Swiss-Prot record:
Organism lineage: Bacteria, Pseudomonadati, Pseudomonadota, Gammaproteobacteria, Vibrionales
A biological-process GO annotation: D-methionine transmembrane transport
Name of the molecule in the record: Probable D-methionine transport system permease protein MetI
Membrane topology: Multi-pass membrane protein
Domain ABC transmembrane type-1 as annotated: residue spans: 21-212
UniProt xrefs under InterPro entries: AA_ABC_Transporter_Permease, MetI-like, MetI-like_sf
GO annotations of cellular component type: plasma membrane
Pfam families in alphabetical order: BPD_transp_1
Length: 225
């Protein structure tokens, strides 16, 4: 394939691919932001209400843990179909980029919660005990000890979540969710266009690599251990 042929192909398909890329970024950004806003506090609650936790409350911990486990165990495609009524209630439709954000967000929340819970478990108990001995309240310990000490792992969890959301957004495209996954299915698979299928796969890989590289750089910057 000559350079002119490649240039012509990209000229013909650039608008389609750029639009799909922005749709993917839009889905991942909104779902990630809401997922973190709800998942991080949920993870903190799971950690602090466990046995011998700062706010020990085993019934609450078990109830929330069960809900989180159920949320994590449902495959994303099944989740998308199962919550169609909820998606229609919130967005007004279950097809399209904005509609895909609803299941993406619901899928992200329990995922983030468990990652945050695991990140907080890495904080040495000695630091928490030292803060308690100085009279710090549970909220002060969470804000000034647990979260700052776990920040590198939390940032790594954010990176993992965003990468996962990219793959989920591609799956959303198989049922009309828009984005690069939608282009790969509609134009690559249904029209038997191997070139556009390959290009969308490469673009997804590049997007994941960019997210991972930025995440790794941020972790290195804040990790002073």
């Amino acid at each position: 394939m000559s350079f002119n042929t490649i240039a012509q192909w990209f000229a013909l398909n650039s608008d389609l691919l750029l639009t799909a890329t922005w749709q993917t970024l839009y889905m991942v950004a909104i779902a990630g932001a809401v997922g973190f806003a709800l998942g991080i506090p949920l993870g903190v609650i799971l950690h602090t209400t466990k046995k011998e936790g700062l706010l020990e409350n085993l019934p609450l911990n078990r109830a929330l843990g069960a809900v989180v486990n159920i949320g994590r165990s449902v495959p994303f495609l099944v989740l998308m179909v199962a919550i169609i009524p909820v998606t229609k209630l919130i967005v007004g439709t279950f097809i399209g980029t904005t509609a895909a954000i609803v299941p993406l967000t619901i899928g992200a929340i329990p995922f983030v919660a468990r990652l945050i819970e695991s990140a907080l478990l890495e904080v040495p108990t000695g630091l928490v005990e030292a803060a308690q001995s100085m009279g710090a309240t549970p909220l002060q310990i969470i804000r000034k000890v647990l979260l700052p000490e776990a920040l590198p792992t939390i940032l790594n969890s954010v990176t993992i979540t965003l990468v996962t959301l990219v793959s989920y957004s591609a799956m959303a495209g198989t049922v009309g969710g828009g984005g690069l996954g939608d282009v790969a299915i509609r134009y690559g698979f249904h029209r038997y266009d191997i070139t556009i299928m390959a290009v969308t796969v490469v673009m997804l890989i590049v997007l994941v690599q960019i997210i991972q590289s930025i995440g790794d750089a941020l972790v290195r910057r804040v990790d002073h251990r």
